[in-house]
Amino acid sequence: MLPIRWFLALLAVFLAVAGLDLWFSQTGARPSSATGEERLDGAAFLAAANAGELREGHIVYRANSTGLADLHAQRKGAAGAGATHVRATARLTDAEVTALRTQHFAEDDPVSYAAARAVSARERTASIVHAIVHPLGLITLIVGILFVVQRYAGRFTAFSAQRLRPVTSGVSFSSVAGCDEAKDEVYEVVEFLRDPARFRQTGGRMPKGVLLVGPPGTGKTMLAKAVAGEARANFYSLSGSDFVELYVGVGASRVRSLFKKARETAPSIIFIDEIDAIGRQRSAAESGGAQQEHDQTLNALLVAMDGFDSDDAVVVFGATNRPDTMDRALLRPGRFDRQVSVGLPDLRGRLAILQVHAGSVKLDPSVDLQEIAKATPGFSGADLANLLNEGAIHAARHRRATILHSDLDEARDKINWGRETRRVMTVQDKAVIAYHEAGHALMQVLSGEDVVRVQKVTIIPRGRSLGSTHFTPERDLFNYSQPQLIAKLRCLMAGRVAEEIALGSITSGASGDIQEATKTARQMVLEWGMSPLGFMALSRPDGDEPLASPQTFHEAERHVRALLDENYAATTRALTTHRAALDAIADELIRCETILGNDVRRIAAQHPPSALAG
């Protein structure tokens, strides 16, 4: 590489010469093209002048010398590049002076002509400077470009030494919770890296790659770190986007350098997060530099995974939440042999994750993590960690030394529905929201479904929601029975029905309930066979064109409409019969703004149904 001091020296020379050139330009000098000079005797000069061969002539009389003068001119045929300056010294007669005047020779005294000759000398110097500056500037520019390219080329090709420095993972399987099945599947990799001879004895071959598939935040990165930590292997962690650059060939170069380094430091674990950034399916329809760079990077990855065997003690872990976009060549045996699903944790998994993260925060002894786990279905490991962190922040904001159950409830509501917003609402607005939420809560209690229970009802706005009813499943639900789906439909309809019964009008607040109820009813009829049409799939799960004929599909739509109408009528009858309980729950909400599920069940028990059951 070119030393930087050489580059700086050349740059200084360039700037100095450029400054000199600028000075000549500012003083008004113009480069002269005169490159030769011809010396004649007086007679020859006068003959050339009388013949009209000279131009721009000057007669410079010498001081204290009668008639003696220096004669200067240029030959007319030498204009432009290579012009010749003609000089002579002669003692002129009056007739000769008159003849030169006829040829437009100027008469100067020695002082004025000396100044003119100084300007001419400066012009010649400026010409020389220009002849030097231009090639020197070009050379300096080329050298500078080479210096920058040599110095920074590594940033656009292979990974830097810092990026390829392996780390020793301090994570163990005890730090990873909520994915026991996934841990069991990848534990074979740990055993192989610890004792590869045992597998070679049976002729077995360990997978070269393991693809971790699951939604974001489920612990895929932690699982890969745990494998490296348990196997005492070097850990290389990169993202798929780290291989993507503007210039074609950069990604492939980085893949090769990564695998070369991993082999040198084996046993090694290479973890590529969001691997779909470089592993997505190739397409012949797409073209251009970006597609060419992607294809070259993917090809380099395929070749690299083919280029090592089990003896290299290098295993590649990839993580993605879009396995359907992966190129099939990358998923074939011999590359990513195994796919491990890392899904959202179940109730037991959520409890285990909460117990792991609870060690880093100060929970009050009254906090029941089992209840928190029940109240957080659908939460990932990252969501649960964030829940405890938000609870700690909420407790600190209220100057408490420990985290209470109410802090975690507030944190969960904030994560699910947004921050609490205190809006100024009229009495009428509060009544509408209170009856709407009271209808949801009461209908869930009346359904008799004990798997999902009302946990809390509030009319305090959060995010876009003006109020909400929170439900807690007693256990994880993996499928739904038809009675459970009917109960869900009626609970969704109860908000609108309560408004209509109590206030005599309806509002736009039920738009989300209508969409969810319609979706559930359509799934019951079109996908799950819960209609008189029987055991028949009428639509695809992805929502594409229907599988049935237009006539059959039209009949199915009529069954969807009938299912909604029937349950809307049943919901109206139930809430009309329990109008007293509905009014009492709504009044309690208007007074307290938030009530617990136990309060809803208590009020419903205290207000038996009326005799108007018809």
Swiss-Prot record:
Any Pfam family hit: AAA
Binding residues annotated for Zn(2+), in chain numbering: 436, 440, 513
Entry's Gene Ontology cellular component terms: plasma membrane
Cofactor note: Binds 1 zinc ion per subunit.
Transmembrane segment boundaries: 6-26, 128-148
InterPro entries: AAA+_ATPase (IPR003593), AAA_lid_3 (IPR041569), ATPase_AAA_core (IPR003959), ATPase_AAA_CS (IPR003960), FtsH (IPR005936), P-loop_NTPase (IPR027417), Peptidase_M41 (IPR000642), Peptidase_M41-like (IPR037219)
Gene3D superfamilies linked: 1.10.8.60, P-loop containing nucleotide triphosphate hydrolases, Peptidase M41
UniProt EC number: 3.4.24.-
Reported function: Acts as a processive, ATP-dependent zinc metallopeptidase for both cytoplasmic and membrane proteins. Plays a role in the quality control of integral membrane proteins.
The name this protein goes by in its record: ATP-dependent zinc metalloprotease FtsH
Organism from which the protein derives: Opitutus terrae (strain DSM 11246 / JCM 15787 / PB90-1)
